Amino acid sequence: MSETSFNLISEKCDILSILRDHPENRIYRRKIEELSKRFTAIRKTKGDGNCFYRALGYSYLESLLGKSREIFKFKERVLQTPNDLLAAGFEEHKFRNFFNAFYSVVELVEKDGSVSSLLKVFNDQSASDHIVQFLRLLTSAFIRNRADFFRHFIDEEMDIKDFCTHEVEPMATECDHIQITALSQALSIALQVEYVDEMDTALNHHVFPEAATPSVYLLYKTSHYNILYAADKH
Protein backbone atom coordinates (compact mmCIF):
# COMPACT_ATOMS: atom_id res chain seq x y z
CA MET A 1 0.00 0.00 0.00
CA SER A 2 1.72 3.17 -1.14
CA GLU A 3 1.16 6.71 0.04
CA THR A 4 -0.57 7.64 -3.21
CA SER A 5 -2.56 4.43 -3.63
CA PHE A 6 -4.54 3.22 -0.63
CA ASN A 7 -8.00 1.90 0.01
CA LEU A 8 -9.48 3.67 3.04
CA ILE A 9 -6.59 4.59 5.37
CA SER A 10 -3.00 5.04 4.20
CA GLU A 11 0.30 4.07 5.72
CA LYS A 12 1.86 6.71 7.95
CA CYS A 13 3.87 9.27 5.98
CA ASP A 14 5.77 12.51 6.61
CA ILE A 15 3.42 15.42 7.17
CA LEU A 16 5.29 17.58 4.67
CA SER A 17 4.27 15.13 1.95
CA ILE A 18 0.89 16.87 1.78
CA LEU A 19 2.61 19.98 0.43
CA ARG A 20 2.35 18.20 -2.92
CA ASP A 21 -1.44 18.62 -2.73
CA HIS A 22 -1.04 22.42 -3.01
CA PRO A 23 2.22 23.06 -4.90
CA GLU A 24 1.35 26.64 -5.89
CA ASN A 25 -0.50 27.77 -2.78
CA ARG A 26 1.63 29.99 -0.56
CA ILE A 27 -0.85 30.07 2.34
CA TYR A 28 -1.30 26.32 2.49
CA ARG A 29 2.48 25.86 2.36
CA ARG A 30 3.03 28.26 5.26
CA LYS A 31 0.38 26.63 7.40
CA ILE A 32 1.51 23.08 6.70
CA GLU A 33 5.13 23.98 7.42
CA GLU A 34 4.00 25.57 10.68
CA LEU A 35 1.95 22.47 11.49
CA SER A 36 5.03 20.29 10.92
CA LYS A 37 6.68 21.87 13.97
CA ARG A 38 4.10 20.11 16.18
CA PHE A 39 3.14 17.10 14.07
CA THR A 40 5.54 14.77 12.30
CA ALA A 41 3.34 12.33 10.41
CA ILE A 42 -0.05 11.88 8.80
CA ARG A 43 -2.32 9.08 7.62
CA LYS A 44 -4.60 9.98 4.77
CA THR A 45 -8.19 8.77 4.70
CA LYS A 46 -10.45 8.25 1.72
CA GLY A 47 -12.67 11.22 0.94
CA ASP A 48 -15.96 9.37 0.90
CA GLY A 49 -18.02 11.38 3.37
CA ASN A 50 -17.09 8.96 6.16
CA CYS A 51 -13.60 10.29 6.79
CA PHE A 52 -14.26 11.75 10.24
CA TYR A 53 -15.77 8.58 11.70
CA ARG A 54 -13.17 6.33 10.09
CA ALA A 55 -10.27 8.55 11.12
CA LEU A 56 -11.46 8.90 14.71
CA GLY A 57 -12.15 5.18 15.07
CA TYR A 58 -8.80 4.11 13.68
CA SER A 59 -6.72 6.76 15.44
CA TYR A 60 -8.19 6.16 18.88
CA LEU A 61 -7.88 2.38 18.65
CA GLU A 62 -4.29 2.75 17.46
CA SER A 63 -3.60 4.97 20.48
CA LEU A 64 -4.76 2.11 22.75
CA LEU A 65 -2.31 -0.46 21.38
CA GLY A 66 -0.24 -1.91 24.21
CA LYS A 67 -2.22 -0.11 26.93
CA SER A 68 -4.10 -2.94 28.64
CA ARG A 69 -5.68 -0.82 31.37
CA GLU A 70 -7.05 1.72 28.92
CA ILE A 71 -8.27 -1.01 26.58
CA PHE A 72 -10.16 -2.69 29.42
CA LYS A 73 -11.79 0.60 30.39
CA PHE A 74 -12.78 1.29 26.80
CA LYS A 75 -14.20 -2.22 26.35
CA GLU A 76 -16.41 -1.67 29.37
CA ARG A 77 -17.73 1.53 27.82
CA VAL A 78 -18.34 -0.13 24.45
CA LEU A 79 -20.29 -2.94 26.12
CA GLN A 80 -22.69 -0.31 27.46
CA THR A 81 -23.41 1.22 24.07
CA PRO A 82 -26.24 -1.17 23.07
CA ASN A 83 -28.20 0.26 26.01
CA ASP A 84 -27.65 3.77 24.62
CA LEU A 85 -28.92 2.66 21.23
CA LEU A 86 -31.96 0.91 22.69
CA ALA A 87 -32.78 3.97 24.80
CA ALA A 88 -32.72 6.09 21.64
CA GLY A 89 -35.27 3.83 19.98
CA PHE A 90 -33.05 1.67 17.78
CA GLU A 91 -34.06 -1.98 17.47
CA GLU A 92 -31.33 -4.44 18.43
CA HIS A 93 -31.55 -6.50 15.25
CA LYS A 94 -30.83 -3.35 13.24
CA PHE A 95 -27.60 -2.46 15.04
CA ARG A 96 -26.27 -5.77 16.37
CA ASN A 97 -24.04 -6.57 13.36
CA PHE A 98 -22.53 -3.08 13.43
CA PHE A 99 -21.91 -3.31 17.17
CA ASN A 100 -20.30 -6.73 16.75
CA ALA A 101 -17.96 -5.38 14.08
CA PHE A 102 -16.80 -2.57 16.34
CA TYR A 103 -16.45 -4.76 19.41
CA SER A 104 -14.46 -7.30 17.39
CA VAL A 105 -11.90 -4.69 16.39
CA VAL A 106 -11.62 -3.55 20.02
CA GLU A 107 -10.88 -7.16 20.97
CA LEU A 108 -8.32 -7.32 18.16
CA VAL A 109 -6.53 -4.33 19.65
CA GLU A 110 -6.47 -6.12 23.00
CA LYS A 111 -5.32 -9.54 21.77
CA ASP A 112 -3.21 -8.78 18.70
CA GLY A 113 -1.78 -5.37 19.48
CA SER A 114 -0.29 -4.68 16.06
CA VAL A 115 -0.75 -1.67 13.82
CA SER A 116 -0.74 -3.86 10.72
CA SER A 117 -3.70 -5.95 11.88
CA LEU A 118 -5.70 -2.88 12.86
CA LEU A 119 -4.94 -1.19 9.55
CA LYS A 120 -5.97 -4.33 7.67
CA VAL A 121 -9.41 -4.29 9.28
CA PHE A 122 -9.93 -0.60 8.58
CA ASN A 123 -8.94 -1.10 4.95
CA ASP A 124 -11.40 -3.94 4.47
CA GLN A 125 -14.38 -2.16 2.91
CA SER A 126 -17.08 -4.27 4.56
CA ALA A 127 -15.58 -4.41 8.05
CA SER A 128 -14.56 -0.75 7.97
CA ASP A 129 -17.97 0.41 6.81
CA HIS A 130 -19.66 -1.65 9.54
CA ILE A 131 -17.46 0.14 12.09
CA VAL A 132 -18.33 3.53 10.61
CA GLN A 133 -22.04 2.71 10.61
CA PHE A 134 -21.86 1.74 14.28
CA LEU A 135 -20.15 5.02 15.14
CA ARG A 136 -22.82 6.91 13.21
CA LEU A 137 -25.64 5.13 15.05
CA LEU A 138 -23.96 5.74 18.39
CA THR A 139 -23.55 9.42 17.55
CA SER A 140 -27.22 9.59 16.64
CA ALA A 141 -28.24 7.81 19.84
CA PHE A 142 -26.19 10.20 21.96
CA ILE A 143 -27.83 13.21 20.31
CA ARG A 144 -31.34 11.72 20.51
CA ASN A 145 -30.90 10.85 24.19
CA ARG A 146 -29.83 14.43 24.93
CA ALA A 147 -32.26 16.21 22.65
CA ASP A 148 -32.84 19.08 25.09
CA PHE A 149 -29.17 20.03 24.86
CA PHE A 150 -28.49 19.43 21.16
CA ARG A 151 -31.68 20.99 19.76
CA HIS A 152 -30.14 24.43 20.36
CA PHE A 153 -27.42 23.68 17.80
CA ILE A 154 -29.51 22.66 14.80
CA ASP A 155 -31.70 24.65 12.42
CA GLU A 156 -35.07 25.55 13.85
CA GLU A 157 -36.83 24.03 10.83
CA MET A 158 -35.40 20.58 11.63
CA ASP A 159 -36.10 18.57 14.78
CA ILE A 160 -33.63 16.19 16.43
CA LYS A 161 -35.09 13.07 14.83
CA ASP A 162 -34.93 14.55 11.32
CA PHE A 163 -31.40 15.83 11.91
CA CYS A 164 -30.17 12.40 13.00
CA THR A 165 -32.05 10.61 10.23
CA HIS A 166 -30.65 12.82 7.48
CA GLU A 167 -27.35 14.25 8.79
CA VAL A 168 -25.91 11.59 11.09
CA GLU A 169 -27.02 8.04 10.37
CA PRO A 170 -26.66 7.74 6.55
CA MET A 171 -23.27 6.67 5.23
CA ALA A 172 -21.33 9.31 3.28
CA THR A 173 -22.97 12.28 5.03
CA GLU A 174 -20.35 14.72 6.28
CA CYS A 175 -20.21 15.79 9.91
CA ASP A 176 -20.08 19.08 11.76
CA HIS A 177 -19.23 20.12 15.32
CA ILE A 178 -22.46 18.60 16.65
CA GLN A 179 -21.53 15.09 15.51
CA ILE A 180 -17.93 15.48 16.67
CA THR A 181 -19.04 16.66 20.10
CA ALA A 182 -21.56 13.84 20.45
CA LEU A 183 -19.24 11.00 19.43
CA SER A 184 -16.32 12.23 21.50
CA GLN A 185 -18.57 12.36 24.56
CA ALA A 186 -20.33 9.08 23.78
CA LEU A 187 -17.04 7.16 23.87
CA SER A 188 -15.09 9.52 26.16
CA ILE A 189 -12.53 10.23 23.44
CA ALA A 190 -10.71 13.55 23.66
CA LEU A 191 -9.59 14.84 20.29
CA GLN A 192 -8.01 17.90 18.77
CA VAL A 193 -8.89 19.10 15.27
CA GLU A 194 -6.34 21.26 13.46
CA TYR A 195 -7.88 23.52 10.82
CA VAL A 196 -5.93 24.43 7.68
CA ASP A 197 -7.62 26.65 5.08
CA GLU A 198 -6.81 29.22 2.41
CA MET A 199 -7.43 32.23 4.63
CA ASP A 200 -4.30 34.24 5.38
CA THR A 201 -4.72 33.85 9.12
CA ALA A 202 -3.04 31.98 11.94
CA LEU A 203 -3.53 28.25 12.40
CA ASN A 204 -6.31 27.36 14.77
CA HIS A 205 -7.57 24.21 16.43
CA HIS A 206 -10.43 22.99 18.59
CA VAL A 207 -10.34 20.44 21.40
CA PHE A 208 -13.35 18.21 22.07
CA PRO A 209 -14.32 18.45 24.87
CA GLU A 210 -12.78 21.80 25.76
CA ALA A 211 -9.73 21.73 28.07
CA ALA A 212 -9.31 17.95 27.69
CA THR A 213 -5.97 16.28 26.93
CA PRO A 214 -6.31 14.85 23.41
CA SER A 215 -5.49 11.26 22.54
CA VAL A 216 -6.47 11.77 18.89
CA TYR A 217 -5.36 14.51 16.49
CA LEU A 218 -7.11 15.15 13.20
CA LEU A 219 -6.37 17.55 10.36
CA TYR A 220 -9.34 19.26 8.71
CA LYS A 221 -8.44 20.62 5.30
CA THR A 222 -10.58 21.15 2.18
CA SER A 223 -13.63 19.62 3.90
CA HIS A 224 -11.72 16.44 4.72
CA TYR A 225 -10.27 14.76 7.82
CA ASN A 226 -6.88 13.03 8.00
CA ILE A 227 -5.03 11.59 11.01
CA LEU A 228 -2.14 13.50 12.58
CA TYR A 229 0.68 12.29 14.83
CA ALA A 230 2.00 14.73 17.42
CA ALA A 231 5.77 15.19 17.53
CA ASP A 232 5.94 14.64 21.29
CA LYS A 233 3.99 11.36 21.13
CA HIS A 234 5.36 9.60 18.06
From Swiss-Prot:
Widely expressed. Expressed at higher level in brain. Its EC number is 3.4.19.12. It catalyses: Thiol-dependent hydrolysis of ester, thioester, amide, peptide and isopeptide bonds formed by the C-terminal Gly of ubiquitin (a 76-residue protein attached to proteins as an intracellular targeting signal). Residues 40-231 form the OTU domain. The keyword Plastid does not apply. Transmembrane segments: none annotated. Keywords: Hydrolase, Protease, Thiol protease, Ubl conjugation pathway. One of its GO terms (molecular function) is ubiquitin binding. The active site is at 48, 51 (nucleophile), 224. SUPFAM superfamilies: Cysteine proteinases (SSF54001). In the structure described by PubMed:15258613, the Asp-48 active site of the catalytic triad is located too far to interact directly with the active site His-224. A possible explanation is that OTUB2 is in inactive conformation in absence of ubiquitin and a conformation change may move Asp-48 in the proximity of His-224 in presence of ubiquitin substrate. Hydrolase that can remove conjugated ubiquitin from proteins in vitro and may therefore play an important regulatory role at the level of protein turnover by preventing degradation. Mediates deubiquitination of 'Lys-11'-,'Lys-48'- and 'Lys-63'-linked polyubiquitin chains, with a preference for 'Lys-63'-linked polyubiquitin chains. This is Ubiquitin thioesterase OTUB2. The gene is OTUB2.
